[in-house]
Amino acid sequence: MRALLHVNGFTYGPLTPLLAYLMAFLGSVIGLQSASRARAAAGASRVRWLTMGSLALGGTAIWVMHFIAMLGFTVPGAEIRYDPVLTIASLVVAIAVTAVGLTLVVTRDGSTQALLLGGFITGTGVAGMHYLGMAALHMEPQKQYDLGTVAASEVIAVVGATAALWFAMRVRGLPAVIGAAIIMGAAITGMHYTGMEALHLSAATATDTTGWVAGMPTAAQNAPSGMSASELLTPLVVGISIATTVMLLIVAMAPTERELREEQRAIELATALRERTY
């Protein structure tokens, strides 16, 4: 016999959801600002801005948001540990799919086909990152997912990613970027908590002899493998948060999209004049 367990996603009250949303918002601001500069840049400069946008959206807005939210996830009586390989793999997936989506829409001038394809790839990848991150959780209770809620979370991820890429190609100016980032932050965190609603945990009842009693570890329980949140997540989250601060400073001090376009036009004009001279 197995019994469903109570899952607490808000162990620290509103603290972890608010911090998670803040990181989703900040990552979105940096990502949108980077995308606007990538639109105006060319060559190596465009690659650098696309890279920073991918790191900000995939690394900060999506991955850090997810694992800050997971710091508030507990199951009474169960020890939770994390697989370091799967956890880091989920970070790589988040950054990679964001890079694909941004590159598609920026290099193809935001065409409808590129937007839809990029949104599908990025959204599917973001949902995959979420469930890969959940697979990284090691605990004695058995994980099960409600397929209807999983599907809903994937739809939210694809729609949110498509909207994010649309914003990346359309918004100009800080007020518009902030407004778009508020919406994107809500979509990203909404997808996470919808995905968490799909999770159900079950454990052996007191009459079972499998070594784990619901809500109460027994002497026979095997400790799950992996690293604790303080050992793995905290250093990663802090490190990426510091990198986010650096990226925010870079964006604040960098030329605006308009200035980059004017600089590009000046270079093209100077090149044309030299060609005429010779």
State where each predicted segment sits.
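Peripheral, non-catalytic segments of secretory and membrane proteins
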Residues: 1-278
